[in-house]
Design a protein with these regions (language model features):
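Terminal or standalone catalytic/regulatory effector modules within metabolic enzymes
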Residues: 48-49, 79-91
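N-terminal small/glycine-rich loop or linker at the start of catalytic domains
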Residues: 3, 8-14, 19-56, 117-137, ...
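Helix-rich catalytic cores of soluble enzyme domains
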Residues: 56-66, 70-73, 86-318
Length: 318
Protein backbone atom coordinates (compact mmCIF):
# COMPACT_ATOMS: atom_id res chain seq x y z
CA UNK A 1 0.00 0.00 0.00
CA UNK A 2 1.10 3.59 -0.59
CA UNK A 3 0.63 6.22 2.11
CA UNK A 4 -1.18 9.38 1.02
CA UNK A 5 -1.76 10.88 4.48
CA UNK A 6 -0.24 10.86 7.96
CA UNK A 7 -1.60 8.26 10.37
CA UNK A 8 -0.74 10.57 13.28
CA UNK A 9 -2.58 13.86 12.90
CA UNK A 10 -0.42 16.02 15.16
CA UNK A 11 2.49 16.13 17.62
CA UNK A 12 0.18 15.64 20.59
CA UNK A 13 -0.60 12.14 19.28
CA UNK A 14 3.02 11.18 18.53
CA UNK A 15 3.75 9.87 22.01
CA UNK A 16 5.52 6.95 23.61
CA UNK A 17 3.62 3.74 24.19
CA UNK A 18 0.70 4.47 21.87
CA UNK A 19 0.36 3.77 18.16
CA UNK A 20 -2.71 4.02 15.93
CA UNK A 21 -2.02 0.44 14.80
CA UNK A 22 -0.91 -1.69 17.78
CA UNK A 23 0.66 -5.07 17.07
CA UNK A 24 -0.25 -8.20 19.03
CA UNK A 25 2.28 -11.03 18.89
CA UNK A 26 4.17 -13.63 20.87
CA UNK A 27 2.90 -14.58 24.31
CA UNK A 28 -0.04 -12.19 24.80
CA UNK A 29 2.03 -9.05 24.11
CA UNK A 30 0.41 -6.02 22.47
CA UNK A 31 2.87 -3.34 21.38
CA UNK A 32 1.68 0.24 20.99
CA UNK A 33 -1.45 -0.07 23.14
CA UNK A 34 -0.44 2.10 26.09
CA UNK A 35 2.85 0.81 27.49
CA UNK A 36 6.52 0.92 26.50
CA UNK A 37 8.23 -2.45 26.83
CA UNK A 38 11.97 -3.17 27.00
CA UNK A 39 13.54 -4.85 24.00
CA UNK A 40 16.75 -6.61 24.97
CA UNK A 41 19.55 -7.08 22.45
CA UNK A 42 22.46 -9.42 23.10
CA UNK A 43 25.27 -11.24 21.36
CA UNK A 44 28.15 -13.62 21.97
CA UNK A 45 31.55 -12.74 23.41
CA UNK A 46 34.47 -13.25 20.98
CA UNK A 47 33.95 -16.85 19.91
CA UNK A 48 34.38 -18.68 16.64
CA UNK A 49 31.06 -20.05 15.41
CA UNK A 50 31.71 -23.47 13.95
CA UNK A 51 30.70 -27.06 14.48
CA UNK A 52 33.41 -27.60 17.11
CA UNK A 53 32.17 -24.69 19.26
CA UNK A 54 28.44 -25.01 18.64
CA UNK A 55 27.64 -26.50 22.04
CA UNK A 56 29.37 -23.53 23.70
CA UNK A 57 27.42 -21.12 21.47
CA UNK A 58 24.13 -22.71 22.49
CA UNK A 59 25.08 -22.57 26.16
CA UNK A 60 25.68 -18.82 25.90
CA UNK A 61 22.19 -18.29 24.53
CA UNK A 62 20.71 -20.54 27.22
CA UNK A 63 22.40 -18.33 29.84
CA UNK A 64 21.32 -15.10 28.15
CA UNK A 65 17.68 -16.11 27.90
CA UNK A 66 17.57 -17.50 31.43
CA UNK A 67 19.15 -14.37 32.94
CA UNK A 68 17.01 -11.88 31.01
CA UNK A 69 13.78 -13.69 31.79
CA UNK A 70 14.67 -14.10 35.46
CA UNK A 71 15.42 -10.38 35.80
CA UNK A 72 12.23 -9.40 33.95
CA UNK A 73 10.15 -11.53 36.31
CA UNK A 74 11.96 -10.17 39.38
CA UNK A 75 11.33 -6.59 38.24
CA UNK A 76 7.69 -7.43 37.49
CA UNK A 77 8.09 -6.08 33.98
CA UNK A 78 4.72 -5.86 32.22
CA UNK A 79 6.31 -7.45 29.17
CA UNK A 80 9.58 -7.88 27.32
CA UNK A 81 10.86 -8.43 23.80
CA UNK A 82 14.06 -10.33 23.07
CA UNK A 83 15.86 -9.63 19.83
CA UNK A 84 18.05 -12.34 18.38
CA UNK A 85 20.29 -10.83 15.72
CA UNK A 86 21.75 -13.77 13.86
CA UNK A 87 25.49 -13.56 13.35
CA UNK A 88 26.60 -14.17 9.74
CA UNK A 89 27.54 -17.81 10.34
CA UNK A 90 24.06 -18.47 11.74
CA UNK A 91 22.48 -17.21 8.53
CA UNK A 92 25.03 -19.03 6.38
CA UNK A 93 23.89 -22.22 8.14
CA UNK A 94 20.15 -21.58 8.56
CA UNK A 95 19.65 -24.56 10.85
CA UNK A 96 21.94 -22.95 13.43
CA UNK A 97 19.90 -19.76 13.56
CA UNK A 98 16.70 -21.77 13.88
CA UNK A 99 18.14 -23.81 16.74
CA UNK A 100 18.96 -20.67 18.74
CA UNK A 101 15.51 -19.27 17.94
CA UNK A 102 13.95 -22.40 19.43
CA UNK A 103 16.08 -22.08 22.58
CA UNK A 104 15.02 -18.48 23.17
CA UNK A 105 11.39 -19.29 22.43
CA UNK A 106 11.45 -22.12 24.96
CA UNK A 107 12.60 -19.77 27.74
CA UNK A 108 9.92 -17.20 26.90
CA UNK A 109 7.23 -19.88 26.84
CA UNK A 110 8.34 -21.23 30.21
CA UNK A 111 8.28 -17.75 31.78
CA UNK A 112 4.82 -17.06 30.38
CA UNK A 113 3.40 -20.35 31.61
CA UNK A 114 5.06 -20.14 35.04
CA UNK A 115 4.96 -16.41 35.82
CA UNK A 116 2.61 -14.86 33.26
CA UNK A 117 5.41 -12.78 31.69
CA UNK A 118 4.13 -11.44 28.39
CA UNK A 119 6.80 -11.51 25.73
CA UNK A 120 7.78 -11.78 22.09
CA UNK A 121 10.88 -12.83 20.18
CA UNK A 122 12.25 -10.71 17.35
CA UNK A 123 14.52 -12.58 14.94
CA UNK A 124 16.80 -10.66 12.57
CA UNK A 125 18.75 -12.72 10.03
CA UNK A 126 21.90 -11.12 8.64
CA UNK A 127 21.62 -9.85 5.08
CA UNK A 128 24.44 -11.90 3.53
CA UNK A 129 23.50 -11.09 -0.07
CA UNK A 130 26.35 -8.59 -0.49
CA UNK A 131 29.09 -11.22 -0.22
CA UNK A 132 29.91 -11.00 -3.92
CA UNK A 133 30.92 -7.89 -5.83
CA UNK A 134 28.69 -6.75 -7.38
CA UNK A 135 26.17 -8.34 -5.00
CA UNK A 136 23.56 -10.83 -6.18
CA UNK A 137 20.41 -9.72 -4.38
CA UNK A 138 17.62 -11.79 -5.94
CA UNK A 139 19.28 -15.03 -7.00
CA UNK A 140 22.16 -17.23 -5.99
CA UNK A 141 23.34 -19.16 -2.97
CA UNK A 142 23.36 -16.21 -0.56
CA UNK A 143 19.72 -15.33 -1.24
CA UNK A 144 18.67 -18.96 -0.91
CA UNK A 145 20.40 -19.21 2.47
CA UNK A 146 18.78 -15.98 3.64
CA UNK A 147 15.35 -17.11 2.46
CA UNK A 148 15.77 -20.45 4.21
CA UNK A 149 16.96 -18.70 7.37
CA UNK A 150 13.74 -16.67 7.50
CA UNK A 151 11.62 -19.75 6.86
CA UNK A 152 13.30 -21.90 9.52
CA UNK A 153 13.33 -19.13 12.14
CA UNK A 154 9.60 -18.60 11.61
CA UNK A 155 9.06 -22.33 11.97
CA UNK A 156 11.19 -22.36 15.16
CA UNK A 157 9.04 -19.71 16.83
CA UNK A 158 10.17 -16.25 15.77
CA UNK A 159 7.37 -13.77 16.51
CA UNK A 160 8.68 -10.63 14.78
CA UNK A 161 10.84 -10.90 11.66
CA UNK A 162 13.19 -8.07 10.73
CA UNK A 163 16.33 -7.43 8.72
CA UNK A 164 18.98 -4.77 8.15
CA UNK A 165 18.94 -5.03 4.36
CA UNK A 166 21.83 -3.78 2.24
CA UNK A 167 20.51 -3.35 -1.30
CA UNK A 168 22.10 -0.24 -2.84
CA UNK A 169 24.72 0.07 -0.09
CA UNK A 170 27.66 -0.34 -2.47
CA UNK A 171 26.64 2.85 -4.31
CA UNK A 172 25.64 4.71 -1.15
CA UNK A 173 28.94 4.00 0.64
CA UNK A 174 30.96 5.48 -2.20
CA UNK A 175 28.66 8.50 -2.28
CA UNK A 176 29.30 9.07 1.43
CA UNK A 177 33.06 8.98 1.08
CA UNK A 178 33.03 11.44 -1.82
CA UNK A 179 30.26 13.65 -0.46
CA UNK A 180 28.29 12.91 -3.63
CA UNK A 181 24.67 13.66 -2.75
CA UNK A 182 23.40 12.39 -6.12
CA UNK A 183 24.96 8.97 -5.50
CA UNK A 184 23.58 8.94 -1.97
CA UNK A 185 20.09 9.76 -3.22
CA UNK A 186 20.33 7.14 -5.98
CA UNK A 187 21.55 4.46 -3.56
CA UNK A 188 18.87 5.21 -0.95
CA UNK A 189 15.95 6.32 -3.08
CA UNK A 190 16.24 4.08 -6.12
CA UNK A 191 18.42 1.00 -5.62
CA UNK A 192 17.63 0.42 -1.94
CA UNK A 193 13.93 1.17 -2.40
CA UNK A 194 13.63 -1.29 -5.28
CA UNK A 195 15.39 -4.00 -3.30
CA UNK A 196 13.24 -3.31 -0.24
CA UNK A 197 10.04 -3.66 -2.26
CA UNK A 198 11.18 -7.00 -3.68
CA UNK A 199 12.54 -8.32 -0.38
CA UNK A 200 9.65 -7.29 1.87
CA UNK A 201 7.04 -8.78 -0.44
CA UNK A 202 8.75 -12.08 0.24
CA UNK A 203 9.28 -11.59 3.97
CA UNK A 204 5.62 -10.63 4.46
CA UNK A 205 4.54 -13.63 2.41
CA UNK A 206 6.64 -15.99 4.55
CA UNK A 207 5.27 -14.49 7.77
CA UNK A 208 1.69 -14.86 6.55
CA UNK A 209 2.32 -18.46 5.55
CA UNK A 210 3.96 -19.15 8.92
CA UNK A 211 0.84 -18.31 10.90
CA UNK A 212 1.56 -16.18 13.95
CA UNK A 213 4.76 -14.39 12.88
CA UNK A 214 4.55 -10.70 12.00
CA UNK A 215 6.72 -8.76 9.55
CA UNK A 216 8.41 -6.17 11.76
CA UNK A 217 10.48 -3.73 9.76
CA UNK A 218 13.80 -2.82 8.19
CA UNK A 219 16.44 -0.29 9.17
CA UNK A 220 18.79 2.04 7.33
CA UNK A 221 21.55 0.99 9.72
CA UNK A 222 23.95 0.21 6.87
CA UNK A 223 23.26 3.62 5.34
CA UNK A 224 22.34 6.39 7.80
CA UNK A 225 23.96 4.84 10.88
CA UNK A 226 27.16 4.44 8.87
CA UNK A 227 26.99 8.14 8.01
CA UNK A 228 26.29 9.00 11.65
CA UNK A 229 29.28 7.04 12.94
CA UNK A 230 31.63 8.45 10.31
CA UNK A 231 30.47 11.95 11.24
CA UNK A 232 31.13 11.28 14.94
CA UNK A 233 34.67 10.30 13.92
CA UNK A 234 35.00 13.56 11.94
CA UNK A 235 35.41 11.62 8.69
CA UNK A 236 32.52 13.41 6.98
CA UNK A 237 30.42 16.50 7.78
CA UNK A 238 27.73 16.11 10.42
CA UNK A 239 25.40 18.15 8.21
CA UNK A 240 25.72 15.50 5.50
CA UNK A 241 25.03 12.73 8.02
CA UNK A 242 21.93 14.60 9.21
CA UNK A 243 20.64 14.90 5.66
CA UNK A 244 21.25 11.18 5.06
CA UNK A 245 19.48 10.38 8.33
CA UNK A 246 16.39 12.24 7.13
CA UNK A 247 16.56 10.75 3.63
CA UNK A 248 16.70 7.23 5.06
CA UNK A 249 13.09 7.43 6.26
CA UNK A 250 11.84 7.19 2.67
CA UNK A 251 13.82 3.99 2.22
CA UNK A 252 12.61 2.32 5.45
CA UNK A 253 9.02 3.30 4.66
CA UNK A 254 9.09 0.91 1.69
CA UNK A 255 8.99 -2.10 4.03
CA UNK A 256 5.63 -0.89 5.38
CA UNK A 257 4.34 -0.32 1.86
CA UNK A 258 5.10 -4.00 1.20
CA UNK A 259 3.73 -5.81 4.24
CA UNK A 260 5.65 -4.77 7.36
CA UNK A 261 3.43 -3.89 10.34
CA UNK A 262 5.99 -3.11 13.04
CA UNK A 263 7.47 -2.84 15.49
CA UNK A 264 10.32 -1.31 13.48
CA UNK A 265 13.95 -2.07 14.29
CA UNK A 266 15.59 -0.29 17.21
CA UNK A 267 18.58 0.98 15.21
CA UNK A 268 16.22 2.58 12.68
CA UNK A 269 16.58 6.10 14.05
CA UNK A 270 14.15 7.11 11.32
CA UNK A 271 11.45 5.38 13.38
CA UNK A 272 9.56 8.52 14.48
CA UNK A 273 8.95 9.44 10.84
CA UNK A 274 7.77 5.89 10.13
CA UNK A 275 5.38 5.97 13.10
CA UNK A 276 3.95 9.36 12.11
CA UNK A 277 3.24 8.21 8.55
CA UNK A 278 2.17 4.59 9.08
CA UNK A 279 0.82 4.56 12.63
CA UNK A 280 2.80 1.38 13.31
CA UNK A 281 4.70 0.90 16.58
CA UNK A 282 8.44 1.51 16.65
CA UNK A 283 11.45 0.38 18.65
CA UNK A 284 14.07 3.00 19.51
CA UNK A 285 17.33 3.37 21.40
CA UNK A 286 19.34 6.38 22.53
CA UNK A 287 21.83 7.85 24.97
CA UNK A 288 19.94 6.67 28.05
CA UNK A 289 19.93 3.04 26.90
CA UNK A 290 22.49 0.88 28.68
CA UNK A 291 24.40 0.39 25.45
CA UNK A 292 23.67 2.52 22.37
CA UNK A 293 25.23 4.57 19.62
CA UNK A 294 26.91 7.74 20.84
CA UNK A 295 24.32 10.45 20.30
CA UNK A 296 22.93 13.55 22.06
CA UNK A 297 19.41 12.71 20.86
CA UNK A 298 18.29 10.18 23.48
CA UNK A 299 15.37 12.15 24.88
CA UNK A 300 13.98 12.75 21.40
CA UNK A 301 14.37 9.08 20.52
CA UNK A 302 12.44 7.97 23.60
CA UNK A 303 9.64 10.51 23.25
CA UNK A 304 7.57 8.39 20.88
CA UNK A 305 8.94 4.84 21.18
CA UNK A 306 6.84 1.74 21.82
CA UNK A 307 9.83 -0.49 22.60
CA UNK A 308 12.98 0.88 24.26
CA UNK A 309 16.03 -1.08 23.24
CA UNK A 310 19.83 -1.21 23.27
CA UNK A 311 22.71 -2.09 21.01
CA UNK A 312 23.79 -5.72 21.36
CA UNK A 313 25.66 -6.46 24.59
CA UNK A 314 28.11 -9.34 24.79
CA UNK A 315 27.40 -12.11 27.25
CA UNK A 316 30.33 -11.38 29.56
CA UNK A 317 30.54 -11.03 33.34
CA UNK A 318 31.41 -7.45 34.26
Amino acid sequence: MAYAAMAVSGPQELVFGRSPKPVRCGFDLTIGAGAVFPEVNFTLPPLAIEAATWDAVKEHYEQIASNVVRRAVALRAPGVVLEFELLPAMTETPEWGAEITAILRRHLRHAYEKSGLRSALRVTPTDIRDQGKPPELRTGAAWEKLRRSFALCIEAGGDILSIESVGGKEVHDQGLMYGDVRSIAFGLGVLAARDMAWLWDRIAEMCAAGGDAVAGGDTACGFANTAMQLAHQKMLPETLAAVVRAMSAARSLVAFEHGAVGPSKDCAYEGPVIKAITGCPISMEGKSATCAHFSPMGNIASAMCDLWSNESVQNVRL
